[in-house]
Amino acid sequence: MLFKCGHNHAHSNGPANHAPASDAGGHTVKVEKLGVRTVDIHCHLHVPEADALLKDVMDLKNEPLLWFANDETRKFQMAHGQNIMPRATDTSLRLAEMDASGVDVQAISTAPNHYCYWAAPELGRDVAQLVNNKLADVVGEHPDRFVGLCTVPLQNPEMAVTELERAVKDLGMRGVEINADVAGNELSRAGLDPFWAKCEELDVIVFIHPSGFAKGD
């Protein structure tokens, strides 16, 4: 589980806030304090070092948001990515926006373009380890504001199990983020029984975040 329930739900920096339901446009707003802890479970951390590790093998076909798009949509997606990049990489900017938006805790997870299920298993493992170490660093610096959801190389279930165990037991991750398919294969067809068993054994949350879609055959 992400948290244990208790009477003191607010983080140590003060009473918790809550954004009004009318704020659906993605804008930072000044919010009313209601005395309950607000947790945002859908928050990505981008790790530039992972980009560097992947730069020689990246292909547009491996980026569904860009590949399955017309030119106008692709242009928008790329501009949007650049717009949010500072907040996805700079913890101080992230914390400032959390405070302004009334978010007490973020469950941070990898940016979907770093799933890398299309890559060779060893490269996927290296990227996962790099990203998970960075997630752990950010959580360790602000343990009252962040919890971590790790990433694992699902293209190799054995490696995925090993990395999941390391991330949970050694790095303190509370869960794992995965894609809704593994390089086009449905989760039910990807040989993931050992992974699901390890998730159950470790009692961790599985956050399924789609990026692209299965082959459909």
Residue ranges of each PLM-predicted region?
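Helix-coil boundary/capping segments in enzymes
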Residues: 1-217
